[in-house]
């Protein structure tokens, strides 16, 4: 059975734990208890494949930022979560993405942008803004509500699909032996 290491990142209070617990335990946690780091495992079937999700729910608080490099190193894919009623959390996404790219030493890291709390009327981040940001990053955007469960499975399952595609790209890189590759120096031994 394939195991996927998913990491949930984002500013404090955006609902990272609520999303994760909604996926794992099917219930909404409405009291806010800042996370340091929690790990969850769940067996699911995605596109006919049984797989094990190993989900790391991380601290959004700045005082735990030193721990980020470690979990970013081990994660295969990242849910970058902001709250649609918190513009600052949306603006913070850029720093999380840059840190992930730096730690992974790659521009090609599986990620999904997640706008949480879409059940709330007091929206300060428009869907269009988030879609534009996701498009500029070349990643999917999904709106979720940990409270109503809307989009929760979709967000995590989409990330698994992104990881699968990433692995396929690494196994089958674009053909570089075409006419544009005159500087290749192949050594056969």
Swiss-Prot record:
The keyword Metal-binding does not apply. Changing residue 83 to T: GTP-binding activity reduced by factor of 30. The modification Cysteine methyl ester is found at residue 186. Alternates between an inactive form bound to GDP and an active form bound to GTP. Activated by a guanine nucleotide-exchange factor (GEF) and inactivated by a GTPase-activating protein (GAP). GTP binds at residues 13-18, 29-35, 59-60, 116-119, 145-147. Changing residue 26 to G: Loss of interaction with PLCE1. A motif (Effector region) lies at residues 32-40. It comes from the Eukaryota. Changing residue 144 to I: GTP-binding activity reduced by factor of 25. It is linked to Costello syndrome: A rare condition characterized by prenatally increased growth, postnatal growth deficiency, intellectual disability, distinctive facial appearance, cardiovascular abnormalities (typically pulmonic stenosis, hypertrophic cardiomyopathy and/or atrial tachycardia), tumor predisposition, skin and musculoskeletal abnormalities. Congenital myopathy with excess of muscle spindles: Variant of Costello syndrome. This is GTPase HRas. It comes from Homo sapiens. The gene is HRAS.
